[in-house]
Amino acid sequence: MKLTKWALPLFFLLFYLLPLDQRPLWSPDENRYAEISREMVSTGDWVVPHFLGLRYFEKPIAGYWFNSISQQLFGDTNFAVRFASAAATGLSALLIVWFALQLWQCRRKAFLAGLIYLSLLIVYGIGTYSVLDAMVTLWLNAAMVSFYLIRQEGPLRTRVAGYLLFGLACGMGFLTKGFIALAVPVIVIVPYVIYQRRLPELLRFGPLAMVSAALLAAPWAIAVHLREPDYWHYFFWVEHIQRFAADNAQHKAPFWYYLPMGLLGTLPWLGLLPGALRKGWQDRKISPETLYLLAWVVLPLLFFSVAKGKLLTYILPCFAPLAMLLAASAVDLLKEGKERAFRVNAWLNGLFGLICLAVLAVLALSPSHAVYGEEDHGALAVAMVIFAGWALLGFIQLKDVSRRWTLSALCPMVLAVGLPWALPQSLIDSKLPERFIEANQTVLMDSSSLLANDVGLASSLAWGTRRSEIQLFDSKGEVHYGLSYPDAKERYVTRSDFPAWLAEARKNGQVALLLKTDKDGSTGSLPPADETIVSHRLTLLVYHGAR
Protein backbone atom coordinates (compact mmCIF):
# COMPACT_ATOMS: atom_id res chain seq x y z
CA MET A 1 0.00 0.00 0.00
CA LYS A 2 1.75 3.15 -1.21
CA LEU A 3 1.76 6.14 1.10
CA THR A 4 0.95 9.56 -0.31
CA LYS A 5 0.34 12.92 1.30
CA TRP A 6 -3.39 12.23 1.08
CA ALA A 7 -3.23 8.78 2.68
CA LEU A 8 -3.71 9.89 6.28
CA PRO A 9 -6.52 12.42 5.65
CA LEU A 10 -8.35 9.89 3.47
CA PHE A 11 -7.82 7.12 6.03
CA PHE A 12 -9.16 9.36 8.79
CA LEU A 13 -12.17 10.44 6.74
CA LEU A 14 -13.17 6.95 5.61
CA PHE A 15 -12.61 5.02 8.81
CA TYR A 16 -13.00 7.59 11.58
CA LEU A 17 -15.50 10.23 10.51
CA LEU A 18 -17.86 8.47 8.10
CA PRO A 19 -18.80 5.55 10.42
CA LEU A 20 -19.39 7.76 13.50
CA ASP A 21 -23.15 8.02 12.99
CA GLN A 22 -23.70 4.41 11.90
CA ARG A 23 -23.99 2.67 15.26
CA PRO A 24 -26.12 3.45 18.32
CA LEU A 25 -24.54 4.88 21.45
CA TRP A 26 -23.00 2.39 23.85
CA SER A 27 -24.32 2.32 27.39
CA PRO A 28 -23.35 3.56 29.86
CA ASP A 29 -20.39 5.70 28.70
CA GLU A 30 -21.54 7.25 25.44
CA ASN A 31 -25.06 7.93 26.64
CA ARG A 32 -23.67 9.56 29.76
CA TYR A 33 -21.39 11.99 27.93
CA ALA A 34 -24.03 12.69 25.29
CA GLU A 35 -26.60 13.59 27.93
CA ILE A 36 -24.27 15.69 30.09
CA SER A 37 -23.38 17.87 27.12
CA ARG A 38 -26.98 18.01 25.87
CA GLU A 39 -28.05 19.31 29.28
CA MET A 40 -25.17 21.80 29.27
CA VAL A 41 -26.37 23.21 25.95
CA SER A 42 -30.06 23.20 26.88
CA THR A 43 -29.61 24.82 30.31
CA GLY A 44 -26.79 27.19 29.37
CA ASP A 45 -24.86 26.16 32.51
CA TRP A 46 -21.25 25.80 31.33
CA VAL A 47 -19.75 25.80 34.84
CA VAL A 48 -21.32 22.98 36.89
CA PRO A 49 -21.69 19.57 35.18
CA HIS A 50 -25.11 17.97 35.53
CA PHE A 51 -26.23 14.48 34.54
CA LEU A 52 -29.94 13.63 34.48
CA GLY A 53 -30.44 17.03 36.06
CA LEU A 54 -28.30 15.98 39.05
CA ARG A 55 -24.93 17.32 40.18
CA TYR A 56 -22.23 15.16 38.62
CA PHE A 57 -18.68 15.84 39.77
CA GLU A 58 -16.82 12.89 38.23
CA LYS A 59 -14.76 14.92 35.72
CA PRO A 60 -13.75 18.56 35.13
CA ILE A 61 -15.40 20.68 32.48
CA ALA A 62 -13.32 20.94 29.29
CA GLY A 63 -14.31 17.58 27.78
CA TYR A 64 -17.96 18.48 28.25
CA TRP A 65 -17.31 21.84 26.60
CA PHE A 66 -15.90 20.22 23.49
CA ASN A 67 -18.75 17.72 23.33
CA SER A 68 -21.28 20.52 23.80
CA ILE A 69 -19.71 22.62 21.05
CA SER A 70 -19.87 19.57 18.81
CA GLN A 71 -23.59 19.20 19.53
CA GLN A 72 -24.13 22.87 18.80
CA LEU A 73 -22.40 22.42 15.44
CA PHE A 74 -23.85 19.07 14.38
CA GLY A 75 -27.05 18.78 16.40
CA ASP A 76 -28.21 16.02 18.74
CA THR A 77 -26.71 13.23 16.65
CA ASN A 78 -24.45 10.29 17.33
CA PHE A 79 -21.91 11.89 15.00
CA ALA A 80 -21.84 14.97 17.22
CA VAL A 81 -21.48 12.86 20.36
CA ARG A 82 -18.37 11.12 19.02
CA PHE A 83 -16.86 13.91 16.96
CA ALA A 84 -14.73 15.46 19.72
CA SER A 85 -13.05 12.10 20.43
CA ALA A 86 -12.41 11.48 16.74
CA ALA A 87 -11.12 15.00 16.15
CA ALA A 88 -8.77 14.74 19.14
CA THR A 89 -7.42 11.45 17.78
CA GLY A 90 -6.87 12.98 14.35
CA LEU A 91 -5.03 15.93 15.88
CA SER A 92 -2.88 13.54 17.91
CA ALA A 93 -1.95 11.76 14.68
CA LEU A 94 -0.97 15.06 13.06
CA LEU A 95 1.11 15.92 16.12
CA ILE A 96 2.84 12.54 15.92
CA VAL A 97 3.65 13.09 12.23
CA TRP A 98 5.07 16.55 12.94
CA PHE A 99 7.08 15.39 15.97
CA ALA A 100 8.53 12.44 14.05
CA LEU A 101 9.62 14.81 11.30
CA GLN A 102 11.39 16.97 13.88
CA LEU A 103 13.16 13.97 15.40
CA TRP A 104 14.23 12.03 12.32
CA GLN A 105 13.84 14.32 9.30
CA CYS A 106 12.31 11.35 7.49
CA ARG A 107 8.92 11.76 5.84
CA ARG A 108 8.36 8.01 5.54
CA LYS A 109 8.90 7.42 9.26
CA ALA A 110 6.65 10.35 10.08
CA PHE A 111 3.72 9.31 7.91
CA LEU A 112 4.04 5.67 8.96
CA ALA A 113 3.94 6.76 12.61
CA GLY A 114 0.67 8.58 11.93
CA LEU A 115 -0.80 5.63 10.01
CA ILE A 116 0.22 3.10 12.65
CA TYR A 117 -1.23 5.28 15.39
CA LEU A 118 -4.60 5.70 13.67
CA SER A 119 -4.85 1.98 12.90
CA LEU A 120 -3.93 0.64 16.35
CA LEU A 121 -6.94 -1.26 17.65
CA ILE A 122 -6.96 0.53 21.00
CA VAL A 123 -6.58 3.97 19.41
CA TYR A 124 -9.37 3.34 16.93
CA GLY A 125 -11.67 1.88 19.57
CA ILE A 126 -11.28 4.81 21.96
CA GLY A 127 -10.96 7.45 19.23
CA THR A 128 -14.41 6.66 17.83
CA TYR A 129 -16.02 6.22 21.25
CA SER A 130 -17.42 9.08 23.29
CA VAL A 131 -15.21 9.17 26.36
CA LEU A 132 -12.75 11.82 27.50
CA ASP A 133 -9.57 9.76 27.09
CA ALA A 134 -8.89 10.70 23.47
CA MET A 135 -9.13 14.38 24.39
CA VAL A 136 -6.89 14.19 27.44
CA THR A 137 -4.43 12.11 25.40
CA LEU A 138 -4.22 14.92 22.85
CA TRP A 139 -3.21 17.38 25.57
CA LEU A 140 -0.73 14.92 27.08
CA ASN A 141 0.79 14.31 23.66
CA ALA A 142 1.09 18.07 23.16
CA ALA A 143 2.72 18.45 26.58
CA MET A 144 5.23 15.66 25.98
CA VAL A 145 6.14 16.92 22.51
CA SER A 146 6.56 20.51 23.66
CA PHE A 147 8.77 19.49 26.58
CA TYR A 148 11.12 17.44 24.43
CA LEU A 149 11.56 20.29 21.98
CA ILE A 150 12.25 22.92 24.66
CA ARG A 151 14.81 20.70 26.39
CA GLN A 152 17.13 21.34 23.45
CA GLU A 153 19.51 24.27 23.52
CA GLY A 154 18.00 27.55 22.36
CA PRO A 155 17.45 31.24 23.18
CA LEU A 156 16.06 32.11 26.61
CA ARG A 157 12.92 33.63 25.08
CA THR A 158 12.21 30.40 23.20
CA ARG A 159 12.62 28.31 26.33
CA VAL A 160 10.33 30.54 28.37
CA ALA A 161 7.67 30.39 25.67
CA GLY A 162 8.11 26.63 25.41
CA TYR A 163 7.62 26.04 29.13
CA LEU A 164 4.57 28.29 29.13
CA LEU A 165 3.16 26.26 26.23
CA PHE A 166 3.96 23.04 28.07
CA GLY A 167 2.04 24.36 31.07
CA LEU A 168 -0.95 25.32 28.94
CA ALA A 169 -1.12 21.79 27.51
CA CYS A 170 -1.00 20.34 31.02
CA GLY A 171 -3.65 22.82 32.12
CA MET A 172 -5.98 21.74 29.32
CA GLY A 173 -5.36 18.12 30.26
CA PHE A 174 -6.27 18.94 33.85
CA LEU A 175 -9.46 20.69 32.76
CA THR A 176 -10.34 17.63 30.69
CA LYS A 177 -9.70 14.79 33.13
CA GLY A 178 -8.16 16.13 36.29
CA PHE A 179 -4.93 15.57 38.19
CA ILE A 180 -3.96 12.49 36.19
CA ALA A 181 -3.06 14.84 33.33
CA LEU A 182 -0.43 16.39 35.60
CA ALA A 183 0.87 13.09 36.93
CA VAL A 184 1.70 11.49 33.57
CA PRO A 185 4.14 14.20 32.37
CA VAL A 186 5.80 14.30 35.79
CA ILE A 187 6.44 10.56 36.03
CA VAL A 188 8.05 10.59 32.58
CA ILE A 189 9.91 13.89 32.60
CA VAL A 190 11.45 13.89 36.08
CA PRO A 191 13.30 10.55 35.71
CA TYR A 192 14.31 11.52 32.17
CA VAL A 193 15.87 14.86 33.14
CA ILE A 194 17.60 13.25 36.12
CA TYR A 195 19.10 10.64 33.80
CA GLN A 196 20.12 13.41 31.38
CA ARG A 197 21.57 15.44 34.31
CA ARG A 198 19.37 18.42 33.49
CA LEU A 199 17.34 18.63 36.69
CA PRO A 200 18.55 22.19 37.50
CA GLU A 201 17.08 23.41 34.23
CA LEU A 202 13.72 21.85 35.07
CA LEU A 203 13.78 23.39 38.54
CA ARG A 204 14.58 26.76 36.99
CA PHE A 205 11.93 26.84 34.26
CA GLY A 206 9.38 24.36 35.60
CA PRO A 207 7.57 26.95 37.77
CA LEU A 208 6.69 28.83 34.57
CA ALA A 209 4.75 25.80 33.38
CA MET A 210 3.04 25.50 36.75
CA VAL A 211 2.00 29.15 36.62
CA SER A 212 0.61 28.95 33.08
CA ALA A 213 -1.31 25.76 33.91
CA ALA A 214 -2.73 27.33 37.07
CA LEU A 215 -3.74 30.55 35.31
CA LEU A 216 -5.54 28.58 32.61
CA ALA A 217 -7.46 26.39 35.07
CA ALA A 218 -8.12 29.01 37.76
CA PRO A 219 -11.17 30.83 36.29
CA TRP A 220 -13.28 27.68 36.04
CA ALA A 221 -11.82 26.13 39.22
CA ILE A 222 -12.83 29.20 41.22
CA ALA A 223 -16.21 29.51 39.51
CA VAL A 224 -17.22 25.92 40.23
CA HIS A 225 -16.05 26.25 43.85
CA LEU A 226 -18.21 29.33 44.34
CA ARG A 227 -21.21 27.55 42.83
CA GLU A 228 -20.63 24.14 44.45
CA PRO A 229 -18.26 24.26 47.47
CA ASP A 230 -18.13 20.45 47.75
CA TYR A 231 -16.94 19.94 44.17
CA TRP A 232 -13.20 19.78 44.80
CA HIS A 233 -13.52 17.61 47.91
CA TYR A 234 -15.55 15.01 46.03
CA PHE A 235 -13.49 15.24 42.85
CA PHE A 236 -10.13 14.86 44.58
CA TRP A 237 -10.86 12.27 47.26
CA VAL A 238 -13.48 10.10 45.58
CA GLU A 239 -12.59 10.39 41.90
CA HIS A 240 -8.82 10.28 42.33
CA ILE A 241 -7.72 8.75 45.63
CA GLN A 242 -10.45 6.10 45.88
CA ARG A 243 -10.47 5.33 42.17
CA PHE A 244 -6.72 4.75 41.91
CA ALA A 245 -5.35 3.84 45.31
CA ALA A 246 -8.00 2.88 47.87
CA ASP A 247 -8.79 -0.73 48.78
CA ASN A 248 -12.33 -0.18 47.45
CA ALA A 249 -11.09 1.41 44.22
CA GLN A 250 -13.36 1.26 41.20
CA HIS A 251 -12.49 -1.21 38.43
CA LYS A 252 -10.00 -3.18 40.52
CA ALA A 253 -7.73 -5.44 38.48
CA PRO A 254 -4.40 -7.26 39.04
CA PHE A 255 -1.03 -5.67 38.35
CA TRP A 256 -0.59 -7.59 35.06
CA TYR A 257 -3.97 -6.48 33.65
CA TYR A 258 -2.46 -4.09 31.10
CA LEU A 259 -0.04 -6.66 29.65
CA PRO A 260 -2.59 -8.75 27.71
CA MET A 261 -4.85 -5.76 27.12
CA GLY A 262 -1.95 -3.68 25.81
CA LEU A 263 -0.78 -6.46 23.50
CA LEU A 264 -4.29 -6.83 22.10
CA GLY A 265 -4.50 -3.07 21.65
CA THR A 266 -1.27 -3.14 19.63
CA LEU A 267 -2.95 -5.14 16.86
CA PRO A 268 -2.59 -5.09 13.88
CA TRP A 269 1.10 -4.26 14.50
CA LEU A 270 1.84 -6.75 17.27
CA GLY A 271 4.46 -8.60 15.24
CA LEU A 272 6.57 -5.45 15.01
CA LEU A 273 6.44 -4.75 18.75
CA PRO A 274 9.32 -6.94 20.05
CA GLY A 275 11.78 -5.61 17.48
CA ALA A 276 10.75 -1.99 18.08
CA LEU A 277 11.19 -2.28 21.85
CA ARG A 278 14.47 -4.18 21.49
CA LYS A 279 15.88 -1.62 19.08
CA GLY A 280 14.71 1.22 21.30
CA TRP A 281 16.47 -0.31 24.30
CA GLN A 282 19.66 -0.89 22.32
CA ASP A 283 19.69 2.71 21.04
CA ARG A 284 18.79 4.39 24.33
CA LYS A 285 22.33 5.60 25.08
CA ILE A 286 23.14 6.95 21.62
CA SER A 287 19.69 8.32 20.83
CA PRO A 288 18.13 10.70 23.39
CA GLU A 289 14.85 10.79 21.46
CA THR A 290 14.55 7.00 21.61
CA LEU A 291 15.13 7.03 25.36
CA TYR A 292 12.46 9.71 25.72
CA LEU A 293 9.95 7.70 23.68
CA LEU A 294 10.70 4.55 25.68
CA ALA A 295 10.19 6.39 28.96
CA TRP A 296 6.95 7.82 27.59
CA VAL A 297 5.72 4.28 26.87
CA VAL A 298 6.96 2.39 29.90
CA LEU A 299 6.69 4.73 32.90
CA PRO A 300 2.97 5.61 32.55
CA LEU A 301 2.26 1.92 31.93
CA LEU A 302 3.99 1.02 35.20
CA PHE A 303 2.19 3.83 37.02
CA PHE A 304 -1.24 2.69 35.88
CA SER A 305 -0.33 -0.95 36.60
CA VAL A 306 0.52 -0.11 40.22
CA ALA A 307 -2.79 1.73 40.67
CA LYS A 308 -5.53 -0.53 42.01
CA GLY A 309 -8.25 0.86 39.75
CA LYS A 310 -7.71 0.01 36.07
CA LEU A 311 -9.46 0.65 32.79
CA LEU A 312 -8.08 -0.03 29.32
CA THR A 313 -8.61 3.60 28.32
CA TYR A 314 -6.11 4.80 30.95
CA ILE A 315 -3.08 3.58 28.96
CA LEU A 316 -4.02 5.33 25.70
CA PRO A 317 -1.28 8.00 26.24
CA CYS A 318 1.35 5.23 25.91
CA PHE A 319 0.50 4.54 22.27
CA ALA A 320 1.64 7.77 20.60
CA PRO A 321 5.33 7.14 21.40
CA LEU A 322 4.84 3.44 20.71
CA ALA A 323 3.55 4.21 17.21
CA MET A 324 6.67 6.28 16.58
CA LEU A 325 8.96 3.51 17.79
CA LEU A 326 7.13 0.99 15.60
CA ALA A 327 7.41 3.23 12.53
CA ALA A 328 11.11 3.98 13.05
CA SER A 329 11.92 0.31 13.56
CA ALA A 330 9.90 -0.73 10.48
CA VAL A 331 11.68 1.72 8.18
CA ASP A 332 15.09 0.69 9.48
CA LEU A 333 14.26 -3.00 8.99
CA LEU A 334 13.19 -2.35 5.40
CA LYS A 335 16.42 -0.48 4.70
CA GLU A 336 18.36 -3.47 6.01
CA GLY A 337 16.29 -5.88 3.91
CA LYS A 338 14.98 -7.74 6.96
CA GLU A 339 11.49 -9.15 6.44
CA ARG A 340 11.06 -11.53 9.37
CA ALA A 341 9.16 -9.13 11.63
CA PHE A 342 6.77 -8.23 8.82
CA ARG A 343 6.12 -11.91 8.09
CA VAL A 344 5.44 -12.57 11.77
CA ASN A 345 3.06 -9.63 11.82
CA ALA A 346 1.22 -10.89 8.74
CA TRP A 347 0.88 -14.36 10.26
CA LEU A 348 -0.38 -12.92 13.55
CA ASN A 349 -3.10 -10.95 11.77
CA GLY A 350 -4.09 -13.97 9.71
CA LEU A 351 -4.22 -16.23 12.75
CA PHE A 352 -6.10 -13.63 14.79
CA GLY A 353 -8.79 -13.51 12.13
CA LEU A 354 -9.03 -17.31 12.03
CA ILE A 355 -9.20 -17.57 15.83
CA CYS A 356 -12.03 -15.04 15.91
CA LEU A 357 -13.83 -17.04 13.20
CA ALA A 358 -13.48 -20.17 15.33
CA VAL A 359 -14.84 -18.36 18.39
CA LEU A 360 -17.82 -17.15 16.36
CA ALA A 361 -18.47 -20.71 15.20
CA VAL A 362 -18.47 -21.96 18.80
CA LEU A 363 -20.82 -19.17 19.85
CA ALA A 364 -23.14 -19.99 16.98
CA LEU A 365 -23.18 -23.78 17.39
CA SER A 366 -22.98 -24.21 21.16
CA PRO A 367 -26.36 -23.70 22.88
CA SER A 368 -24.69 -23.24 26.26
CA HIS A 369 -22.59 -20.33 24.94
CA ALA A 370 -25.05 -18.90 22.43
CA VAL A 371 -24.65 -15.17 21.80
CA TYR A 372 -26.23 -14.97 18.36
CA GLY A 373 -29.90 -15.99 18.44
CA GLU A 374 -32.24 -17.20 15.72
CA GLU A 375 -32.92 -13.61 14.66
CA ASP A 376 -29.18 -12.89 14.32
CA HIS A 377 -28.21 -14.94 11.25
CA GLY A 378 -27.46 -11.80 9.25
CA ALA A 379 -25.39 -10.28 12.05
CA LEU A 380 -23.45 -13.52 12.46
CA ALA A 381 -22.71 -13.61 8.74
CA VAL A 382 -21.40 -10.03 8.84
CA ALA A 383 -19.22 -10.84 11.86
CA MET A 384 -17.72 -13.82 10.03
CA VAL A 385 -17.05 -11.70 6.94
CA ILE A 386 -15.27 -9.14 9.15
CA PHE A 387 -12.81 -11.61 10.62
CA ALA A 388 -12.41 -13.48 7.37
CA GLY A 389 -11.41 -10.13 5.88
CA TRP A 390 -8.97 -9.54 8.75
CA ALA A 391 -7.38 -12.95 8.14
CA LEU A 392 -7.25 -12.41 4.38
CA LEU A 393 -5.54 -9.03 4.76
CA GLY A 394 -2.93 -10.74 6.92
CA PHE A 395 -2.24 -13.70 4.68
CA ILE A 396 -2.10 -11.83 1.35
CA GLN A 397 0.89 -9.88 2.66
CA LEU A 398 3.01 -13.03 2.73
CA LYS A 399 3.44 -13.14 -1.05
CA ASP A 400 5.32 -9.81 -1.12
CA VAL A 401 5.61 -8.73 2.48
CA SER A 402 8.13 -5.91 1.94
CA ARG A 403 5.62 -4.11 -0.29
CA ARG A 404 2.33 -5.20 1.25
CA TRP A 405 3.04 -5.00 4.99
CA THR A 406 1.16 -1.71 5.40
CA LEU A 407 -2.06 -3.52 4.43
CA SER A 408 -2.19 -4.43 8.11
CA ALA A 409 -3.57 -0.93 8.70
CA LEU A 410 -6.78 -2.02 6.98
CA CYS A 411 -7.43 -4.97 9.32
CA PRO A 412 -9.21 -3.01 12.08
CA MET A 413 -10.97 -0.95 9.46
CA VAL A 414 -12.84 -4.02 8.21
CA LEU A 415 -14.10 -4.32 11.77
CA ALA A 416 -14.96 -0.63 11.89
CA VAL A 417 -17.04 -0.72 8.73
CA GLY A 418 -18.95 -3.91 9.55
CA LEU A 419 -19.40 -3.64 13.33
CA PRO A 420 -22.79 -1.84 13.37
CA TRP A 421 -24.34 -4.74 11.42
CA ALA A 422 -22.53 -7.55 13.26
CA LEU A 423 -24.00 -7.11 16.74
CA PRO A 424 -26.43 -9.71 18.15
CA GLN A 425 -29.80 -8.46 19.34
CA SER A 426 -29.09 -9.52 22.92
CA LEU A 427 -26.02 -7.27 23.00
CA ILE A 428 -27.93 -4.43 21.35
CA ASP A 429 -30.63 -4.55 24.02
CA SER A 430 -28.06 -4.84 26.81
CA LYS A 431 -25.48 -2.26 25.72
CA LEU A 432 -27.20 -0.23 22.98
CA PRO A 433 -30.74 0.42 24.26
CA GLU A 434 -31.10 3.36 21.88
CA ARG A 435 -32.76 1.13 19.27
CA PHE A 436 -35.33 -0.21 21.74
CA ILE A 437 -36.08 3.33 22.86
CA GLU A 438 -36.48 4.51 19.27
CA ALA A 439 -38.87 1.63 18.56
CA ASN A 440 -41.05 2.69 21.49
CA GLN A 441 -40.64 6.44 21.08
CA THR A 442 -44.38 7.17 20.88
CA VAL A 443 -45.17 5.43 24.16
CA LEU A 444 -42.28 7.13 25.92
CA MET A 445 -43.05 10.61 24.61
CA ASP A 446 -46.70 10.21 25.68
CA SER A 447 -45.62 9.42 29.25
CA SER A 448 -45.55 12.20 31.82
CA SER A 449 -43.20 10.21 34.08
CA LEU A 450 -40.24 8.07 33.01
CA LEU A 451 -38.30 5.72 35.28
CA ALA A 452 -35.39 3.33 34.83
CA ASN A 453 -33.70 0.85 37.16
CA ASP A 454 -30.26 1.44 35.69
CA VAL A 455 -28.34 4.70 35.25
CA GLY A 456 -27.21 3.69 31.77
CA LEU A 457 -30.84 3.06 30.78
CA ALA A 458 -31.85 6.36 32.36
CA SER A 459 -29.27 8.25 30.32
CA SER A 460 -30.44 6.47 27.16
CA LEU A 461 -34.00 7.50 27.97
CA ALA A 462 -32.94 11.08 28.60
CA TRP A 463 -30.98 11.26 25.35
CA GLY A 464 -33.71 9.53 23.34
CA THR A 465 -36.54 11.69 24.65
CA ARG A 466 -34.51 14.89 25.20
CA ARG A 467 -35.74 14.94 28.81
CA SER A 468 -33.42 15.02 31.80
CA GLU A 469 -35.98 14.43 34.58
CA ILE A 470 -35.76 10.62 34.52
CA GLN A 471 -36.58 8.99 37.87
CA LEU A 472 -34.14 6.39 39.20
CA PHE A 473 -35.91 3.23 40.34
CA ASP A 474 -34.46 0.83 42.91
CA SER A 475 -30.82 1.61 42.04
CA LYS A 476 -28.81 4.81 42.45
CA GLY A 477 -25.66 3.66 40.67
CA GLU A 478 -23.12 6.32 39.73
CA VAL A 479 -25.49 9.22 40.51
CA HIS A 480 -25.74 8.34 44.21
CA TYR A 481 -23.80 11.50 45.05
CA GLY A 482 -26.12 13.77 43.08
CA LEU A 483 -29.14 12.07 44.64
CA SER A 484 -27.79 12.80 48.14
CA TYR A 485 -28.62 16.51 47.85
CA PRO A 486 -31.92 17.60 49.46
CA ASP A 487 -33.26 19.05 46.21
CA ALA A 488 -32.81 15.66 44.48
CA LYS A 489 -34.46 13.34 47.01
CA GLU A 490 -37.63 12.95 44.94
CA ARG A 491 -35.67 11.73 41.91
CA TYR A 492 -35.21 8.28 43.46
CA VAL A 493 -38.00 5.75 44.04
CA THR A 494 -37.45 2.56 46.02
CA ARG A 495 -39.20 -0.67 45.09
CA SER A 496 -41.19 -0.65 48.33
CA ASP A 497 -42.34 2.94 47.76
CA PHE A 498 -43.21 2.40 44.10
CA PRO A 499 -46.90 1.37 44.44
CA ALA A 500 -47.76 4.51 46.42
CA TRP A 501 -45.61 6.70 44.18
CA LEU A 502 -47.23 5.20 41.07
CA ALA A 503 -50.75 5.85 42.31
CA GLU A 504 -49.90 9.52 42.77
CA ALA A 505 -47.93 9.86 39.51
CA ARG A 506 -50.74 8.36 37.41
CA LYS A 507 -52.93 11.30 38.37
CA ASN A 508 -50.68 13.45 36.18
CA GLY A 509 -50.61 11.09 33.21
CA GLN A 510 -49.04 7.94 31.84
CA VAL A 511 -46.03 6.34 33.57
CA ALA A 512 -43.34 4.29 31.78
CA LEU A 513 -40.84 2.14 33.68
CA LEU A 514 -37.88 0.75 31.71
CA LEU A 515 -36.15 -2.20 33.34
CA LYS A 516 -32.98 -4.12 32.66
CA THR A 517 -33.76 -7.59 33.97
CA ASP A 518 -31.75 -10.67 34.79
CA LYS A 519 -31.48 -13.43 32.22
CA ASP A 520 -34.71 -15.00 33.47
CA GLY A 521 -36.58 -11.80 32.59
CA SER A 522 -38.09 -11.43 36.06
CA THR A 523 -39.19 -7.92 37.04
CA GLY A 524 -39.90 -8.79 40.66
CA SER A 525 -43.04 -7.83 42.52
CA LEU A 526 -44.48 -4.78 40.78
CA PRO A 527 -48.02 -3.54 40.18
CA PRO A 528 -49.44 -5.10 36.98
CA ALA A 529 -48.88 -2.87 33.96
CA ASP A 530 -51.41 -1.92 31.29
CA GLU A 531 -48.81 -2.67 28.61
CA THR A 532 -45.67 -4.79 28.74
CA ILE A 533 -43.06 -4.68 25.98
CA VAL A 534 -40.16 -7.13 26.18
CA SER A 535 -36.99 -7.53 24.13
CA HIS A 536 -34.41 -9.88 25.62
CA ARG A 537 -33.33 -8.28 28.91
CA LEU A 538 -35.23 -5.02 28.38
CA THR A 539 -38.77 -4.72 29.71
CA LEU A 540 -40.93 -1.63 29.34
CA LEU A 541 -43.89 -1.41 31.71
CA VAL A 542 -46.53 1.16 30.77
CA TYR A 543 -49.10 2.37 33.28
CA HIS A 544 -51.87 4.47 31.79
CA GLY A 545 -52.88 7.67 33.49
CA ALA A 546 -55.71 7.58 36.02
CA ARG A 547 -59.08 8.51 34.53
From Swiss-Prot:
Pathway membership, UniProt: Lipopolysaccharide metabolism; 4-amino-4-deoxy-beta-L-arabinose-lipid A biosynthesis
One term of GO molecular function: mannosyltransferase activity
GO BP term, example: protein O-linked glycosylation
Purpose: Catalyzes the transfer of the L-Ara4N moiety of the glycolipid undecaprenyl phosphate-alpha-L-Ara4N to lipid A. The modified arabinose is attached to lipid A and is required for resistance to polymyxin and cationic antimicrobial peptides.
Identification of the protein by name: Undecaprenyl phosphate-alpha-4-amino-4-deoxy-L-arabinose arabinosyl transferase
Keyword Oxidoreductase: no
Annotated TM spans: 1-21, 83-103, 111-131, 174-194, 205-225, 253-273, 286-306, 311-331, 346-366, 378-398, 408-428
EC number per UniProt: 2.4.2.43
Pfam assignment, any one: PMT
Reactions performed catalytically: 4-amino-4-deoxy-alpha-L-arabinopyranosyl di-trans,octa-cis-undecaprenyl phosphate + lipid IVA = lipid IIA + di-trans,octa-cis-undecaprenyl phosphate
Topology of the protein relative to the lipid bilayer: Multi-pass membrane protein
Keywords: Cell inner membrane, Cell membrane, Glycosyltransferase, Lipid A biosynthesis, Lipid biosynthesis, Lipid metabolism, Lipopolysaccharide biosynthesis, Membrane, Transferase, Transmembrane, Transmembrane helix
Cellular component annotations (GO), alphabetically ordered: plasma membrane
UniProt KW Signal keyword: no
Entries under PANTHER family matching the protein: MANNOSYLTRANSFERASE YKCB-RELATED, UNDECAPRENYL PHOSPHATE-ALPHA-4-AMINO-4-DEOXY-L-ARABINOSE ARABINOSYL TRANSFERASE
InterPro entries given in the database record: ArnT_tfrase (IPR022839), Glyco_trans_39/83 (IPR003342), LipidA_mod_glycosyltrf_83 (IPR050297)
Taxonomy, superkingdom: Bacteria
Main location: membrane
Entry similarity comment: Belongs to the glycosyltransferase 83 family.
Localisation per UniProt entry: Cell inner membrane
